[in-house]
Every structure is written in structure tokens, then in C-alpha cells.
Amino acid sequence: MEQKIYNEYVEILKEELLPAMGCTEPIAVAYAAAVAVQALGEKPESVEVNVSANIIKNVKSVVVPCTGGLRGIGAAVCAGIVAGCPEKELEILEEITEEQKVEMKEMLDTMPMTIQESDKGYIFDIQIKVCAGEHSGYAEIAGFHTNVICVKKDDAIIHEKEYEEQGSSCVTDRSLLTVEKIVEFADCVDVADVEEVLQRQIDYNWAIAEEGMTGKWGAAIGKTLMEAYGNSVHNRAKAMAAAGSDARMNGCELPVVINSGSGNQGMTTSLPVIVYAKELNVSREMMLRALVVSNLITIHMKTGIGRLSAYCGAISAGCGAGAGICYLYGGRAYEISHVIVNAVAINSGVVCDGAKASCAAKIASAVEAGLLGLQMQKNGKQFYGGDGLVEKGVENTIRNIGELAKKGMRETDKTIIQIMTR
């Protein structure tokens, strides 16, 4: 593999596999609020919030961690104001005290706050203005969760950069990602170059999945799967991924390592691979290489889909998980390509109606599609070009899914948001 491409792939993993405390959209709102307060330089007396429709959708129903069970945009704003420390970015709420939780609740009940939909037309946009007396602080995040594009104190610009419409977090060229090159990279990568980010993903995501399986979180999809369908590796792979989401969507304070800006996607793409690696008793190095495959396949698919969409992000991550497990079984580019095509043909079209408890069930469905796609490939079965969205060549099919999500589901997204906010 060319050194330039090799280096870019390493960098992509480092850019995307970030730790985050809680569902990433409300955490991004909290982060923006903390940045705005830092610019103001004093405790705010009122807040004005303008966010894109997809932020409204993804923050409305999910529990903001470390808030004592509070939900919604207002709760996320108050959490960020009280927490401060914007330098922590997506881990901004990791050291909240009980006293601060009480302060958040009081602030939510008493702070004058307006929340409106942004008129900028961005898919991902968070604007927060905090005011005290005659002074104000302003912060805007656009495109992705930590992309602060503007900070102001009154009318004085502290920080400003041009917003790129594609909203990508990368400094790399994502067009370099292909299934064939991803598998080649997984085969040749010096594990030391990716070990830190992948081991953190294993540690964090496994811990929250175990918490989801043992604690009382949400609809307990992970537990339900285990009770109903037993201890097979197939079922455990689904259940552990779902259990992580059970905990995360319902306020668990454990961090996860995200993928493509999403903790649910980070867990979906990694936990099934870890379960199978343990079952197959493969070496740690082999597990890490399989996680390279699963993570990069998910990132590759999400690049065309976009960060936020009406298309459920877990579907891509389930494909990534199936690809990573195929790698564990000795599959390489040819076999993995068929797994991906099979999986997306099964489950594409599942909608995203925001972050909430039922995401865990969608994750289980996404992992099931990945595993069924794998079993089809192992049995010599496949879907062919012309079968719906499937087109000959895995890259063509991935492109079609991106087009469906980004273009075809725009009106679907609007309708979902209208239903959720009426």
C-alpha cells in the first residue's frame, strides 16, 4: 500500500474513533453552550438557541447524561453552562457533581431560554447566544460535533472559520476509502499505529455494554434478546451491541468510543466483532485488524450518507460489523464485498427518528442483517445487480445507498421532524 494512503487511513481512524460522554448531539449542544459562556466571561442571565431540525430530532427524546435524567435541548444547554470546561469537548460532562446536577435543574426551571429552528439550512447547526446585562457570548458549531466555526463576545469575533457544506470532520481525502483498500490496509497495518484508538474502543464500549446488560436501562433490549434467544454467539453479538445502546440512550454516564460522530454506530460496529473474536479465540492482533475493517467500512459508507440523515446510521455500522466478522473468518475483499451488499439489501430504508431507547432495537436489527449477509456469503448466496438498490460492484451499491440517504430521504426527514415536534 502506498505510504500516503496508509497514513491517511491511520489518520481517519484517529479522527473518527473519539471518546464521548453521552449521546453526541446533546453533548455537542452542551459543548456549544460552554464555549459561548466562556466567551461571555460571566454567568448568563438568558439564552437564545437556534439549531437545525436534525439536532432537534436527535436531542428531543434522549437522556442527557450526568443531569439526573433530564432530556432535551434546554437540559443540554444548562448542562454545558454549569459544566464549563469546553476544552473537554465531547467529554464535557464527565465530572459533574451532585451539586451541579441540582444547579442544572434549577437553571432549566428558571433561566429565560428561547429555542428555535435555525434558518441557515445546514443539516448540522448549533447556535447558542448567552446574555448577561448588556453583554453576550455566542458560539456556533456546524457540520460535525466539535466543529466550532464562530465564537463572539458581543460583536467582537474571537474565532471564525469558513464552514464547508459537506460537514466532514476530516483533514483527509475520504475518496481514498474503498473496500479493497480497507482490507489491504487491515492486512498490512502496523498494529502499533492503531492500537491506542482501537483498544480504547474495546475497553469503553465493552464496559458500557456490560452495564447495559446488568443494569436497568431503557427498554432492556439486550437483556430481552438474551432471555428470549439464548447464549449463542450470534445472539450475544446482537445483544451486547443493543445493551450498550440501552445504557447510552438512557443516561448512563460511562463514555463510549464513537464512529462517524455516533456512539450507537461506534458500539454497533465494534461490539459484535469483539464478541466473535472472543468466541473464535483469535489473537488480539487479529481482533484489532478486524476492528480496522469494521470501523473503516462504516466510515466509508457514512461518508456518502452524511452525519445526520433520515437513514438510520446503525444500518451502515451493522454492515461494518458483518464485514469485520467476515475478516475474522478469513474473508477478504471479495467475501467482505458480498457481505456488505447482502446486508444493505436487507435493511436499507430503516429511518432515523432521533436518539432514544428504541435505537437499541434498531441496532439489533442492523447487526442481524450484517450476520445474515455473512451467512449468505458463506453459503454461496448473494443478491445481484438489479435487485433493488443493488448494483454490480460493491462501490456502486455503497454509492446508491448514499444517494438514497442524502437525496431520496430529504422529505422523509422533514416529515419525521414535523411529526416529532407537533
Identify what each model region corresponds to.
Residues 1-11, 43-56, 232-251, 283-301, ...:
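Acidic-glycine-rich active-site phosphate/pyrophosphate-binding loop
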Residues 43-47, 88-93, 115-116, 192-198, ...:
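Flexible, glycine/charged-enriched surface loops at secondary-structure junctions
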Residues 20-24, 51-58, 65, 142-146, ...:
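A structural signal for small-residue-enriched, beta-sheet-centric alpha/beta enzyme cores
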Residues 36-39, 65, 276-289, 299-365, ...:
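Hydrophobic alpha-helical bundle architecture
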